[in-house]
């Protein structure tokens, strides 16, 4: 790796006792090139940083690395994955977001994460995903425990850099669980002159021994020294202690797997992956796999992507908040921030995506919904950038039309063209990766034969076969349950008609998305969109005059202003699609459950008269049956723009055996088998 000195002005403002060297900061490469596990020839480096909350050195290091990446000269063949663990108010994270050396869009994205104050894993993908940064916000030990060990050893963390102030034994063992067997540890010495030297040295020596006990080769890092002296080898573990440490690491991993056996996170197999789809979710999955250099065959029943539920002219993108802010609300917040990032990345890559992050204004439409919104906004200390309460006057000023009620304003939200977003993601995937696309290809059956997947299809009026494929992902919206392997999935289709409203005064003054009993967008191409209807298991997708009137009524009953008279549906212009919805409103993402095997085991428990407690324990500790190599991505409901891209990224990480950018509760929330397993692990009837 190159060893290029870099002057970092941002460190000059540090307190003298905390600054490692205010005149010169060693480069990222100068520090990590000392580690053999992170050799310069390694094309994929995975490094984690765990600084103390008040440290400022990480901002300088990361800004320098991002600047290199932005030059498009340094990381052309090398992929770097950084994991950053930070408290919400960590000064170094704030310094990174405000760094003058950090270019947009990275600066903007990191600032959005800081401002949002949303705990959990935030993924940033830069320079066509050659540089990935996962920011894990919250208590570091909690965040580490919540991360699932990568199923592929080569995808585990190769090196750690942590302050002595930020490290203890519990943290070290969780770091070890997430690491490669030969991973190394850089322990940053504390140079604060105000500390007692004897006590400081004793603490450093103790931490060094704990790090070695956990199986790491430990190095000490002193940023005040020259590049050729800043890293010194503290000690390597003996062969005997290393063997004990590896046993402990495996036990920790097994303990976690056993705890969540009902939620299998099996990785994909080596080889080509087939994706059946055509909407936002499948397109983003194709892009996520292309960024990893994976070979993909993409199957779409239509002549182009984005012709089904993702074909609307405009769709609202905003979070789904709840008063208790549980896993569902938390996931939608993370997904919301990731979707915004994805859209901006595609725009920066030259793709045209009509959109406007003009904000979303949500108001109630009856007494119950008014009370619900009041409860939501008052229940949590939402960040100003996420959601804030507004009165009727403020709402009117934001909307540009008269709003007679108080509500919630989402400043970062807005609208985007789902079809354009879908097509841009597919186009970028084809540009980056090894993707073959098949259009006007209706998959009629799938089968697993000789450990491979095969597809039967109708294309150009002819029966054709495709395969073999190592992995198969069903992301085909309303056709998700068309196959024998998935026809029991607890998911339903809801028809939705979106009405197109001509732009005219005073409606054309609308400048933010309105959401109450339905939504209404600002005009694009001289049309507003409003809707949508919600009809379960509809028999057809024809235009409905009844639903057109219902959409109009929703607007006029939600808002009493004179401007609603300009909402004109007489042109009978609308678009109809079907969105797939789960009972808990969360998407389905992960291994395809084998319902026949689940049902057979359940019946066996009944026949052998297992007690409720015995049956529950069995389901809790036994890996739930799945179809090998088959995965589900669907059930995005009405907010697929918010939830779909992140679900696709998590699934791509699972397929590739990586450390997943999601906590265990969110992974359990998304699992396609959750409706059944929630009952079975409690000993209830299937």
UniProtKB/Swiss-Prot annotation:
Its main location: cytoplasm. It catalyses: 5-aminomethyl-2-thiouridine(34) in tRNA + S-adenosyl-L-methionine = 5-methylaminomethyl-2-thiouridine(34) in tRNA + S-adenosyl-L-homocysteine + H(+). Its EC number is 2.1.1.61, 1.5.-.-. One of its GO terms (cellular component) is cytoplasm. It holds the Pfam family DAO. GO terms for molecular function: flavin adenine dinucleotide binding; oxidoreductase activity, acting on the CH-NH group of donors; tRNA (5-methylaminomethyl-2-thiouridylate)(34)-methyltransferase activity. Residues 276-686 are annotated as: FAD-dependent cmnm(5)s(2)U34 oxidoreductase. It comes from the Bacteria. Keywords: Cytoplasm, FAD, Flavoprotein, Methyltransferase, Multifunctional enzyme, Oxidoreductase, S-adenosyl-L-methionine, Transferase, tRNA processing. One of its GO terms (biological process) is tRNA wobble uridine modification. InterPro entries: FAD-dep_OxRdtase (IPR006076), FAD/NAD-bd_sf (IPR036188), tRNA_MAMT_biosynth_bifunc_MnmC (IPR023032), tRNA_S-uridine_synth_MnmC_C (IPR017610). Residues 1-258 are annotated as: tRNA (mnm(5)s(2)U34)-methyltransferase. SUPFAM superfamilies: FAD/NAD(P)-binding domain. The keyword Flavoprotein applies. Its cofactor is FAD. It is found in: Cytoplasm. Catalyzes the last two steps in the biosynthesis of 5-methylaminomethyl-2-thiouridine (mnm(5)s(2)U) at the wobble position (U34) in tRNA. Catalyzes the FAD-dependent demodification of cmnm(5)s(2)U34 to nm(5)s(2)U34, followed by the transfer of a methyl group from S-adenosyl-L-methionine to nm(5)s(2)U34, to form mnm(5)s(2)U34. In the N-terminal section; belongs to the methyltransferase superfamily. tRNA (mnm(5)s(2)U34)-methyltransferase family. This is tRNA 5-methylaminomethyl-2-thiouridine biosynthesis bifunctional protein MnmC. It comes from Shewanella loihica (strain ATCC BAA-1088 / PV-4). The gene is mnmC.
């Amino acid at each position: 790796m190159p060893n290029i000195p870099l002057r970092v002005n941002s460190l000059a403002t540090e307190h003298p006792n905390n600054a490692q060297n205010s005149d010169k900061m060693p480069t990222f490469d100068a520090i990590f090139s000392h580690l053999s596990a992170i050799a310069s020839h390694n094309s994929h480096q995975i490094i984690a940083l765990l600084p103390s909350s008040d440290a400022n050195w990480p901002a300088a290091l990361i800004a320098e690395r991002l600047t290199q990446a932005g030059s498009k000269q340094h990381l052309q063949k090398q992929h770097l994955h950084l994991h950053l663990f930070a408290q919400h108010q960590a000064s170094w994270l704030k310094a990174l977001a405000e760094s003058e050396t950090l270019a947009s869009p990275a600066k903007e994205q990191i600032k959005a994460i800081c401002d949002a104050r949303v705990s959990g894993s935030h993924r940033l993908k830069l320079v066509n995903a050659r540089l990935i940064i996962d920011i894990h916000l919250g208590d570091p030990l909690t965040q580490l425990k919540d991360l699932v060990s990568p199923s592929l050893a080569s995808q585990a963390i190769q090196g750690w850099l942590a302050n002595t102030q930020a490290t203890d034994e519990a943290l070290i063992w969780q770091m070890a669980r997430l690491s490669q067997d030969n991973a190394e540890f850089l322990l940053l010495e504390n140079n604060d002159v105000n500390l007692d030297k004897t006590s400081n040295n004793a603490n450093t020596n103790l931490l060094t021994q704990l790090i070695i006990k956990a199986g790491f080769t430990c190095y000490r890092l002193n940023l005040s020294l020259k590049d050729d002296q800043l890293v010194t080898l503290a000690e390597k573990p003996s062969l005997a202690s290393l063997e004990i440490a590896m046993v402990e690491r495996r036990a920790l991993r097994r303990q976690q797997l056993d705890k969540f056996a009902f939620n299998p996170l099996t990785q994909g197999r080596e080889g080509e992956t087939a994706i059946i789809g055509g909407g936002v979710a499948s397109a983003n999955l194709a892009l996520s796999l292309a960024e990893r250099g994976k070979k993909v065959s993409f199957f779409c029943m239509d002549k182009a992507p984005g012709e089904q539920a993702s074909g609307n002219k405009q769709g609202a993108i905003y979070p789904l908040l709840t008063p208790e802010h549980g896993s569902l609300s938390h996931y939608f917040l993370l997904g919301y921030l990731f979707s915004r990032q994805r859209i901006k990345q595609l725009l920066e890559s030259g793709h045209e995506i009509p959109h406007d992050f003009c904000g979303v204004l949500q108001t109630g439409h009856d007494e119950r919904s008014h009370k619900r919104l009041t409860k939501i906004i008052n229940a949590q200390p939402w960040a100003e950038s996420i959601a804030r309460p507004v009165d009727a006057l403020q709402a009117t000023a934001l909307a540009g039309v008269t709003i007679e009620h108080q509500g919630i304003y989402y400043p970062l939200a807005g609208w985007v063209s789902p079809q354009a977003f879908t097509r841009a993601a597919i186009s970028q995937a084809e540009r980056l990766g090894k993707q073959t696309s098949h259009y006007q290809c209706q998959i009629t059956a799938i089968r697993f034969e000789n450990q491979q997947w095969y597809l039967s299809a109708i294309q150009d009026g002819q029966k054709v076969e495709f395969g073999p494929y190592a992995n198969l992902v069903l992301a085909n919206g309303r056709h998700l349950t068309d196959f024998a392997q998935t026809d029991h999935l607890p998911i339903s289709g809801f028809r939705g008609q979106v009405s197109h409203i001509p732009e005219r005064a005073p409606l054309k003054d609308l400048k933010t998305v309105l959401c109450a009993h339905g939504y209404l967008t600002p005009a694009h191409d001289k049309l507003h969109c409003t809707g949508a209807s919600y009809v379960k298991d509809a028999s057809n997708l024809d235009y409905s005059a009844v639903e057109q009137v219902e959409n109009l009524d929703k607007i006029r009953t939600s808002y009493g202003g004179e401007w609603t008279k300009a909402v004109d549906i007489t042109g009978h212009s609308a678009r109809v699609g079907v969105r797939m919805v789960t009972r808990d409103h969360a998407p389905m993402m992960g291994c395809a459950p084998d319902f026949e095997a689940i049902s057979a085991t359940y019946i066996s428990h009944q026949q052998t008269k297992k007690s409720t407690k015995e049956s529950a324990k069995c389901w809790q500790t036994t890996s739930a049956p799945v179809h090998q190599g088959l995965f589900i991505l669907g059930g995005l409901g009405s907010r697929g723009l918010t939830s779909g891209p992140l679900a696709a990224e998590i699934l791509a990480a699972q397929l590739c055996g990586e450390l997943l950018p999601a906590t265990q509760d969110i992974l359990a929330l998304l699992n396609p088998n959750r409706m059944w397993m929630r009952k079975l692990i409690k000993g209830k009837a299937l």
